[in-house]
Amino acid sequence: MRILLIRHGDPDYENDSLTEKGRREAHMLASRLINERIDYIYTSTMGRAMETAKPTLEAKGMKAEPLDWLREFSAKRIRRPDYNGELAPVCWDWLPEDWTVRPVLYDKDNWFKDDIMAEPDMGSYEKMVHEGLDTLLAGHGYEREGMYYHTDKANDDTIALFCHFGLGCVILSHLLGIAPLPLMQGFAAAPTSVTTIYTEERREGIASFRVACYGDTTHLYVNNETPSFSARFCEMYSNKEERHD
């Protein structure tokens, strides 16, 4: 099995839609995916993800199944120190000096229990994503068994998930068995980037997942479109024109 994890295009967060740049990116993505074999497409129920998927669906003559658990992983009551007493809207974009000193945030089973996190249902929210993903994979022949997957219906189907950066990190953390926060803090998936994940079945019936390519944006480069800076911060503090907070 192959999973294509696709982030939405350049976002207009206020209106949960795409910017003009994001719409261009979505059409460039479609021109790439038209030549890819994709068997099933699933989308977040948020506007920016569905708008990103639309050109691909039209180009391929396919329909997508919307899934609520693919919505952005937005825990909105996080007590990040840089918010000076206010509650942060997301559980990523931490300053390194605030999160790296808290070992529990590296723990895949307990990261959401840290007392700096005020979201009361964080664990339940993560569980909902895990269960949604495992139910989807079971429907495609791969049943979760501990930290790997059992299959008696192995296949080379390709499924595409049009979703979000934070949610994508939670998906990867579950498939790879690591905490999501180091992924959220250490990786940047540009808008319309494609992350490719394959199953590996080295022994019959026992499968795991491996990331073959993360955050690919070649469809933008071949069209002379610079990837959006979204999900990144300034390379140097002195770069005043780049995002600092």
Locate each region found by the language model.
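Extreme N-terminal starter segment of soluble prokaryotic enzymes
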Residues: 1-4
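Conserved beta-strand termini and adjacent loop/short-helix elements that scaffold enzyme active sites
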Residues: 6, 67-69, 212-214
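Active-site metal-binding loops of divalent metal-dependent hydrolases
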Residues: 9, 165, 215-217
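Short catalytic helix/loop segments, enriched in acidic residues and glycine
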Residues: 18-33
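Phosphate-coordination/substrate-recognition cap region in phosphate-metabolizing enzymes
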Residues: 31-112
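Short glycine-rich phosphate-binding loop at a beta-alpha junction
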Residues: 39-45, 148, 158-161
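Acidic, low-complexity terminal tails and accessory targeting/binding regions
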Residues: 73-93, 147-158, 170-245
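Internal catalytic-core helix/loop-beta-alpha segment
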Residues: 114-148
